[in-house]
Swiss-Prot record:
Pfam families: 7tm_4. SUPFAM superfamilies: Family A G protein-coupled receptor-like. GO terms for cellular component: membrane; plasma membrane. It comes from Mus musculus (Mouse). Keywords: Cell membrane, Disulfide bond, G-protein coupled receptor, Glycoprotein, Membrane, Olfaction, Receptor, Sensory transduction, Transducer, Transmembrane, Transmembrane helix. It is found in: Cell membrane. Potential odorant receptor. Its main location: membrane. Residues 1-27, 81-96, 158-208, 261-274 are extracellular. This is Olfactory receptor 8C8. It is a multi-pass membrane protein. Glycans are attached at residue 8. InterPro entries: GPCR_Rhodpsn (IPR000276), GPCR_Rhodpsn_7TM (IPR017452), Olfact_rcpt (IPR000725).
Length: 313
């Protein structure tokens, strides 16, 4: 039924993805570079997920959220990276209308879910530092599962809303997407029908989600900072900062790179420039997250040593 609706609404049956650049001399170097990036992202996130599963000392709320963050980054990179790599080796990288809408849906689902998971992680750090005596009660397995389920549910709802609005548009003439993936803003200029609802949806839904998540994260860290200031021991300071450091870096990278891609001065707000900024949060952030949590975390380092001993013994 959906397939019939999409065909009736649009005369375009497929789109052509322009990719990151059309300069021939850059195609091979960029293919190798992003293939290495993709391999590192997949291996890094799979390794971290396996470490958390195999080591009982990592079966805590903090690592439960981290497992889901790695799972999202793993899936997230698989949504568009293979198709992006094809753009470097094919003369014409096409994607069907249905495939484009599916890619858009899963991209939005995972990126929104990651935003909410990062918010849940900030709340977890707040409870761990500010309410250590009741931490296990507040962050019970039931509450943790509820927070993760809510994160995925909110991501699903947002993706459904945006994709549903996009499917309703008519695409008549141009089918060339000036991007390496199907995203909201590269698709809107191709529509020959009104995009007012889509633009309103993007402003309201995305704006509300960002404000809500950022507000919860900022309040959580404000409370943590207030608590740290009143700590008497330097050891407490060090432990608190060590616990939050990795998450602060991850949040800064995720939201900072996202803002670069979508919130720019009007003079620079073009899709062509946006796709270069998109590389940071679509390709670099999923690759860096496992490294950030591995290099700065003693528990993960210990888990690596234990797992390595099991393999070699």
């Amino acid at each position: 039924m959906m397939q019939i609706t999409m065909e009736n609404k649009s005369s375009v049956s497929e789109f052509i993805l322009m990719g990151l650049t059309d300069q021939p001399e850059l195609q091979l170097p960029l293919f190798v570079l992003f293939l290495m990036n993709y391999t590192a992202t997949v291996m890094g996130n799979l390794t971290l997920m396996n470490l958390i599963c195999l080591n009982s000392n990592l079966h805590t709320p903090m690592y439960f959220f981290l497992f889901n963050l790695s799972f999202i980054d793993f899936c997230y990179s698989m949504v568009f990276t293979p198709k992006m790599l094809m753009s470097f080796i094919l003369e014409k990288n096409t994607i069907s209308f249905g495939g484009c809408m599916a890619q858009l849906f899963f991209f939005l689902f995972f990126v929104n879910s990651e935003s909410y998971v990062l918010t849940a992680m900030a709340y977890d750090r707040y409870v761990a530092i500010c309410k250590p005596l009741t931490y296990k009660v507040i962050m019970s397995p039931k509450i943790c599962c509820l927070l993760i389920f809510s994160s995925y549910l909110m991501g699903f709802a947002s993706a459904m809303a945006h994709t549903g609005c996009m499917i309703r548009l008519s695409f008549c003439d141009s089918n060339i997407i000036n991007h390496y993936m199907c995203d909201i803003f590269p698709l809107l200029p191709l529509s020959c029908s009104s995009t007012y609802v889509n633009e309103l949806m993007s402003s309201v839904v995305v704006g509300s989600a960002i404000i809500l998540c950022c507000l919860i994260i900022l309040i959580s860290y404000a409370m943590i900072l207030f608590n740290i200031i009143h700590m008497s021991s330097g050891k407490g300071w060090s432990k608190a900062l060590g616990t939050c450091g990795s998450h602060i870096i991850t949040v800064s990278l995720f939201y900072g790179s996202g803002l670069l891609a979508y919130v720019k001065p009007s003079s620079a707000k073009t899709v062509g420039q946006g796709k270069f900024f998109s590389v940071f949060y679509t390709l670099l952030v999923p690759m860096l997250n496992p490294l950030i949590y591995s290099l700065r975390n003693k528990d993960v380092k210990l888990a690596v040593k234990k797992t390595w001993k099991r393999i070699t013994s």
